[in-house]
UniProtKB/Swiss-Prot annotation:
Catalyzes the ATP- as well as the pyrophosphate-dependent phosphorylation of a specific serine residue in HPr, a phosphocarrier protein of the phosphoenolpyruvate-dependent sugar phosphotransferase system (PTS). HprK/P also catalyzes the pyrophosphate-producing, inorganic phosphate-dependent dephosphorylation (phosphorolysis) of seryl-phosphorylated HPr (P-Ser-HPr). It catalyses: [HPr protein]-L-serine + ATP = [HPr protein]-O-phospho-L-serine + ADP + H(+); [HPr protein]-O-phospho-L-serine + phosphate + H(+) = [HPr protein]-L-serine + diphosphate. GO terms for molecular function: ATP binding; magnesium ion binding; phosphorelay sensor kinase activity; protein serine/threonine kinase activity; protein serine/threonine/tyrosine kinase activity. It comes from Leptospira borgpetersenii serovar Hardjo-bovis (strain L550). HAMAP family: HPr_kinase (MF_01249). The gene is hprK. Its EC number is 2.7.11.-, 2.7.4.-. This is HPr kinase/phosphorylase. Residues 206-215 are annotated as: Important for the catalytic mechanism of both phosphorylation and dephosphorylation. The active site is at 143, 164, 182 (proton acceptor), 248. Homohexamer. Belongs to the HPrK/P family.
Length: 318
């Protein structure tokens, strides 16, 4: 698992929706942002720096701007001295408000990027929080195929050559959608949600033994692919051998941990004559039913228990 960070320059140059313009501190554009939380330093500007989150992006909204611009020069000098005594990665003023010159001077001297945006504070925080959540989410790479089947994101896993790509190709021909083949990039966006995607280089491509590299979007159309998908089920394809024990009732609920999230796991034996794509489709529909609270295996088990209990009573009347 990796915990990536991004440079301040990434926010400035690659996210036009933020509307950022650099005023000072160009030498600090390589400063790293390692957390998705932001900080509004309102209380800190009054002199209370206990628990000051200096390692976050500092956002100056209308309130902070109005406060510092209303101070007399001597007070503002003291505010700046205290504020810039901390190591800061960047400072952003919203609503197009221009910071005082003492902020510009300190940011230039200390190589702290100082930027402004015409976007309102509330909208800006919403936008940048989403960007940081996506960019800084814990992530890992997983060998397999990620495909959307009946709206369920399924990660097909298993040893090389077991038939993952061939199974996915048949599912695509049936109208389902490819997300990633071979290497799946997985990000944890919350405590219980994993998003799978593909690298730009491999996106929409598959490798099939005997055919080579295929462009799925060109062959099957734009409706056969998507860029990312929530991972809700893992299906592990395993070569069938007599000594392996596979679940035959559905009462077991095995899971596999990915980035600290438990994902439902189904182990499917692979051998000649088995129609794996239709098994995957059925697993997807069954998973949708389970999400709605309907579990066929448990219902059948309950019926069986009731039947056996009823038979026991009939054989042993009071």
């Amino acid at each position: 698992m990796s915990m990536p960070g991004i440079n301040v320059s990434n926010l400035l140059n690659e996210h036009e929706e933020l509307g950022l313009r650099l005023l000072a501190g160009e030498k600090g554009l390589t400063n790293r942002i390692n957390m998705s939380e932001i900080n509004r330093p309102g209380l800190s500007l009054t002199g209370f720096y206990e628990s000051f989150a200096h390692d976050r992006i500092q956002i100056f909204g209308k309130g902070e701007w109005a406060y510092i611009t209303s101070r007399i020069p001597e007070d503002l000098k003291n505010i700046a001295a205290d504020f810039f005594s901390f190591h800061l990665n960047c400072i952003i003023f919203t609503h197009g408000n221009m910071p005082p010159s003492i902020f510009t001077e300190n940011c230039e001297r200390l190589a702290i990027p100082l930027m402004i945006s015409d976007v309102s504070t509330h909208k800006f925080i919403t936008l940048i929080s989403g960007i940081l959540d996506r960019s800084l989410a814990p992530r890992t790479m997983r060998h397999g195929v990620l495909i959307e089947v009946f709206g369920i994101g399924i990660l097909l896993s298993g040893k090389s050559g077991v038939g993952k790509s061939e199974t996915a190709l048949e599912l695509i021909e049936r109208g389902h959608r490819l997300v990633a083949d071979d290497m799946v990039e997985i990000r944890r966006l919350s405590e219980s949600y994993l998003i799978g995607t593909c690298s730009d280089l491999l996106r929409h491509h598959m490798e099939i033994r005997g055919l080579g590299i295929l462009n799925i979007k060109d062959i099957f159309g734009i409706g056969s692919v998507r860029d990312h998908k929530l991972i809700e089920l893992i299906i592990r394809l395993e070569e069938w051998t007599e000594d392996k024990d596979f679940d035959r009732t559905g009462l077991e609920n095995p899971t596999e941990e990915l980035l600290g999230v438990q994902i439902p796991l189904i182990r499917v034996p692979v051998k000649p004559g088995r129609n794996i794509p239709i098994i995957v489709e059925t697993a997807a529909m069954n998973q949708r039913l389970r999400k709605l609270g309907k579990n066929a295996a448990q219902e059948f088990n309950q019926k069986l228990s009731n039947y056996l209990q009823q038979g026991k009573v009939e054989r042993n009347p009071p």
